[in-house]
Amino acid sequence: ITVPIAKNNVKYNQINFVDMPNAVQSNISLTNNVDLKMNHPEYHAVLIANKILGGGFNSYLNMNLREEHGYTYGARSSIGTDKYASRFTAGASVRNAVTDSAVVETLKEINKIKTEFVTPEELSNAKAKYVGDFVLALERPSTVARYALNIKTNNLPEDFYSTYLEKINAVTAEDVKRVANTYFK
């Protein structure tokens, strides 16, 4: 099998608009390619940064686009850690009339996490969410099997999951800002 090489990201922001005259809402998606593997030293910091930006209800994106402006039922971001090619995506489905405003606000929140330090409370809440999810997931046998498979298929160190919480809790506000600048374009 030949695995295609991911294309480089564009050098500037570009907007591709697809006009759908009968659509009642717009789906906005801000996306860039990333090269992030689970065995990368910045992996845990990227998880925390994404959680704060758009990985939960209290994230920057959701609080702005849903709670502050009422543009959407939910805004989110995600980042992949695929073995070959991955991407960062931030977006939401919004009313047509606020598409442009939602894009501006999404870019504003991405810029915020890249230029400002997250608060101690935001950092603590994101870490607590990962710790809680990790502990609960261990109660399912399928999770333990998936973790063992991940170690083999993703070239992870044998202690990857036994040091997972330690690495999550070691993430700093400086780490979040640094990785946001690297991975959230």
Labelled PLM ranges:
Residues I1, K108-F117:
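A common structural junction motif
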Residues I1-N39, G54-S101, E122-K129, T143-Y147, ...:
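Non-catalytic beta-strand/loop surface segments
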Residues P41-I48:
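PPIase-associated folding chaperone regions across multiple families
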Residues A49, V103-I110:
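Short amphipathic C-terminal alpha-helix that caps PH/PH-like domains
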Residues D133, N150-T153:
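Non-catalytic accessory/assembly modules
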Residues R140:
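Hard-cation-handling environments
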Residues E158:
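Acidic/polar loop-and-plug regions of large Gram-negative outer-membrane beta-barrel proteins
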